[in-house]
Amino acid sequence: MQFSELVDAVRKNPLDVTITEDWGQGRASFGGLMVALQYEAMRAQVSSERALRSLAVTFVGPAEPGVPVSFEVEVLREGKAVSQVLGRAVQNGQVVTLVQGSFGGARESAVKVDSLPAPDMKAPEQCPLLPYIKGVTPEFMR
């Protein structure tokens, strides 16, 4: 299953997503994947005008590939400038990943820091593929 298909699954129904076994390492799904999918569920609950400002992650237990996961979201506080959001990835009734995020809008400041522009990047379909090497690269690279 492609990463984009998993993201689409979270967008369609975050409470019932099954991560395929090719996204696993041993008995657990890759942690970065769990965070990306939980973030996607959280992002959907916050105004697009509020950018992600911080993200704290706790891996509570392994998320077993092939078993449905529920990416739950609770907006803890929707303030004037910042939204505090808690995400829980739950599997078999147990929390496997906790993610707390702060999303905030732009605001006036006496501090001015010029940011560098984002680099130009090709679309994923235009990038060279990393070859699959059995025992070296993860199964999802196939």
Question: What is each of the regions a protein language model found here?
Answer:
Residues M1-R142:
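Terminal targeting signals and extreme-terminal segments of soluble enzymes
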